[in-house]
């Protein structure tokens, strides 16, 4: 009997490692603490009115990266406010559907027919190389077997979705979002979505400041020829890194938490491209094309939206009200030229930026604030899919993003891999549509899944918006919405099967 136990012991160790790896592997989160907290500024402003209106500058990143470092006075304002106003209600099915549809080419058009041939081949090759990295990004140093490869491929295809139908600018943003960190953090809600859900769970009224067109359409107006230049330069930068652990930087998170976000935002281009000094072989003509793109987007995505947001806030200030409002919008709208705070002050309003040390009396946040903002956090122990992604036939986990200037690349990441969606998948066909390159160009194959997604009929009232002339805005046709979700039944089943085999081996040994 001792011999049998010795023989089965390595199997037991292997199975226990599998369970521990699948349920205990932590997700990548960040927490940054500044050395001089006494003088640290929060991204919280107060408009002196009765009652006051508060403005909070967010970052569109997974909430776990920031929530612990959000100052107490911001959390107090969230607790005492009766209303939370966000850029867009990403939890609203119509908003999500329209944002997704906005990203796609007109009917009967594909990237294969739009992109220059050589550029299309480069995109195909790059996707194949990134697909080969997914098992390493998901499982780390764990051995890569057939099951992990299959699951990695399923997640990859779910994240790139119907990529051949994307407009070129959205293809560029998809490519920039495919990094190890984004894959590992795909199921963590963005801070904006977390605040939205938490406020709604606390019984507060959550309203939208904008509609999807104001955020999406400026990108679709870009000249495709110049977008092709940006896409080529992005691939020039990423291709040498494609066989390694491509990661996004957290330096802006540290800068944000330490109260000096202004310099970073003012110098960063809107498109998710590295700085010009990092782009190889950049000609003066290419640099001019990239600069003209950035100038156009700054005027449309930053300045025009700043004007609209400030008008919305001023309209609210002119009303007779007795309730407190908190506006949680991207921090980039509060810094730089012609920002929201500057426009409010120009109209005579008193707006003060608050220090983290300034106390704001208010009731404490509920103890279950995390589960209100992130319902999936209650399943952490059994969240095997944090390392083994699945695509069950219900409950997809992605919604399209909001587009704010200071973190535009991260916002686009949420379209493909971050927040949980409220869509219901009636049917999912993972029938690969294979695009093969002939031997004259490359021996590369990329499979793209197709999916049928239907938004549910909501029992709640229609999402309220603070914007003006909503009746003049129409919805675009819906389009394919890629999704990849984690299923609780799958998680429990895998753990049960593993434990069953452990007991079976022990029993046979005895």
From Swiss-Prot:
Enzyme nomenclature, EC number: 3.4.-.-
Signal peptide extent: 1-30
Region (Disordered): 435-477
GO biological process: negative regulation of Wnt signaling pathway; proteolysis
Recorded GO MF terms: metal ion binding; metalloendopeptidase activity
Catalytic class of the enzyme: hydrolase
UniProt entry keywords in alphabetical sequence: Glycoprotein, Hydrolase, Membrane, Metal-binding, Metalloprotease, Protease, Signal, Transmembrane, Transmembrane helix
A Gene Ontology term for the protein's cellular component: membrane
Database matches in Pfam families: TraB_PrgY_gumN
Compartments it resides in: Membrane
Residues passing through the membrane, by range: 490-510
Cofactor, free-text remark: Divalent metal cations. Mn(2+) or Co(2+).
Membrane topology, record value: Single-pass type I membrane protein
Main localization category: membrane
Domain of life: Eukaryota
Residues in the Extracellular compartment per record: 31-489
PANTHER family, per database record: METALLOPROTEASE TIKI, METALLOPROTEASE TIKI HOMOLOG
Function: Metalloprotease.
Family affiliation: Belongs to the TIKI family.
Protein name, UniProt field: Metalloprotease TIKI homolog
């Amino acid at each position: 009997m001792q011999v049998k136990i010795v023989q089965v012991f390595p199997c037991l160790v292997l199975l226990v490692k599998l369970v521990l790896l699948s349920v205990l592997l932590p997700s990548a989160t960040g927490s940054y603490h500044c050395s001089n907290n006494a003088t640290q500024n929060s991204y919280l402003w107060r408009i002196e009115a009765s009652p006051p209106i508060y403005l909070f500058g967010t970052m569109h990143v997974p909430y776990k990266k920031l929530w612990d470092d959000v100052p107490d006075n911001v959390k107090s304002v969230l607790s005492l406010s009766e209303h939370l106003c966000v850029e867009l209600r990403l939890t609203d099915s119509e908003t999500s559907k329209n944002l997704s549809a906005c990203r796609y080419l007109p009917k009967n058009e594909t990237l294969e027919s739009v992109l220059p041939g050589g550029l299309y081949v480069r995109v195909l090759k790059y996707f194949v190389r990134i697909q080969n990295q997914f098992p390493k990004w998901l499982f780390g140093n764990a051995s890569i077997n057939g099951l992990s490869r299959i699951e990695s491929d399923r997640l990859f295809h779910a994240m790139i979705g119907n990529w051949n139908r994307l407009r070129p600018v959205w293809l560029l943003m998809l490519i920039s979002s495919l990094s190890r960190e984004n894959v590992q953090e795909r199921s963590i809600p963005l801070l904006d979505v977390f605040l939205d859900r938490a406020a709604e769970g606390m019984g507060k009224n959550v309203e939208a400041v904008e509609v999807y067109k104001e955020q999406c359409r400026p990108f679709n107006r870009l000249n495709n020829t110049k977008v092709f230049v940006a896409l080529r330069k992005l691939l020039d930068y990423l291709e040498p890194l494609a066989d390694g652990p491509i990661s996004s930087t957290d330096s802006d998170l540290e800068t944000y938490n330490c109260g000096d976000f202004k310099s970073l935002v003012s110098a960063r281009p809107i498109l998710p491209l590295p700085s010009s000094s990092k782009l190889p072989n950049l000609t003066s003509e290419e640099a001019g094309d990239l600069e003209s793109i950035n100038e156009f987007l700054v005027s449309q995505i930053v300045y025009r939206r700043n004007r609209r947001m400030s008008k919305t806030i001023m309209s609210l200030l002119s009303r007779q009200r007795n309730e407190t409002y908190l506006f949680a919008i991207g921090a980039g709208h509060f810094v730089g030229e012609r920002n929201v705070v500057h426009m409010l002050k120009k109209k005579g309003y008193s707006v003060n930026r608050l220090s983290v040390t300034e106390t704001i009396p208010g009731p404490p946040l509920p103890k279950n604030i995390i589960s209100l903002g992130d319902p999936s956090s209650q399943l952490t122990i059994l969240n095997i899919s944090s390392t083994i992604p699945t695509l069950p036939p219900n409950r997809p986990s992605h919604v399209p993003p909001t587009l704010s200037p200071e973190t535009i690349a991260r916002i686009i990441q949420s379209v493909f891999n971050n927040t949980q969606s409220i869509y219901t998948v009636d049917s999912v066909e993972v029938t690969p549509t294979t695009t093969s390159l002939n031997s004259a160009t490359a021996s590369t194959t990329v499979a793209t899944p197709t999916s049928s997604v239907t938004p549910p009929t909501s029992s709640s009232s229609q999402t309220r918006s603070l914007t003006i002339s909503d009746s003049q805005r129409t919805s675009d046709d819906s389009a394919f919405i890629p999704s990849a979700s984690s299923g609780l039944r799958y998680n429990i089943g895998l753990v049960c099967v593993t434990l069953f085999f452990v007991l079976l081996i022990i029993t046979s040994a005895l």
